[in-house]
Amino acid sequence: ETSSVEFSKDDPDSVSPSDGADADMTAQPEQMEQEIDEAVSEALSSYQFSADNFNSMTSVLRGIGEQGDKSIVTVSSGKQDTDIFGNPVENTGDYAGAVIAESDGEFLIFTYADAVRAADSINVRFSDGTKIAGTVRQIDEVLGMAVVAVPSGNLPEEERKKVQVLSLANSYTVKAGDVLVGIGGPSGQVHSLSFGTVSYVARNVQITDGLTRILYADISSNSQTGTFLINTAGEMVGWTSESCRSESCTDRTAAYTISSYKPILERLTNGASAAYLGILGQDVS
């Protein structure tokens, strides 16, 4: 009997600790708020941000990214074709994948549908160079998501111990100004890193069969290779996609928020397809 994978479900109305603090502050007298604002402004104006401070901050972010990179693998797909002379050739492509669960002796890897769609062969390469044949657990063509499974026992024990399952965050708590780290393939190469901040969180965005939230961030990403966004706790808050980019915000990276899609990802991980009615809402004036 196989065990099913479950991901925690999040409350859309949940707030981050800092949001809660802000809510409490609004109940205080206006005079206290003004005094606090003046004190903060004075402290910031007198603070000298040195190169050492900057290097220290980037060092911390680099450490978060390197830790998250332990969950990243390379998903290689092979497609049989023929050259101009009719000789058989195999076209291959590399994509980033993130290990999001380990169950029944298998690593379950979240990747992009482009990585496995119509592939004749799938190989997953781990950081030590070990390649393991993978199988598609399920694909969601609407969102461009896919889950690939590989037997964890085929990986050398020492390397298997290094692989870390990437936790899924409560992305409903993400707000503008939060610092994010991009892992996967933000530079177009798997195992690259990038840093940035959330510029805007778009709520109630119309998608097939419902509403979602989209993160916009000033962070380098590559949705063709695959980029996953993690918070400073090292948890995945979303993944980038060109399909969710707004025409009015083309200079920012756009990402689906993970909390909105945990139920779908859970179904894919357990081999079940995601059901859609195909309804896309529209504002009527």
Feature annotation, model-predicted:
Residues E1-I84, S121-N123, P156, M236:
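N-terminal targeting leaders that route proteins to membranes or the secretory/organellar pathways
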Residues F49, A101-G184, G188-Q189, S223:
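Conserved active-site neighborhood of the chymotrypsin/trypsin-like protease fold
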Residues F54-G63, K79-Y112, K131-A133, V165-S167, ...:
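A conserved glycine-rich beta-strand in the N-terminal activation segment of trypsin-fold
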Residues K70-V75, G97, F107, T111, ...:
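Terminal peptide-recognition signature
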Residues I84-N91, I139-L143, L155-R160, V201-L215, ...:
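Gly/Ser-enriched beta-turn/beta-hairpin loop segments
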Residues S152-V165, S194-A254:
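Active-site region of chymotrypsin-like
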Residues N170-G210, R245-S248, R267-L268:
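Flexible, gly/ser-rich surface segments that form the specificity/activation loops bordering the active-site cleft
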Residues M236-S285:
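C-terminal cap/linker of serine protease catalytic domains
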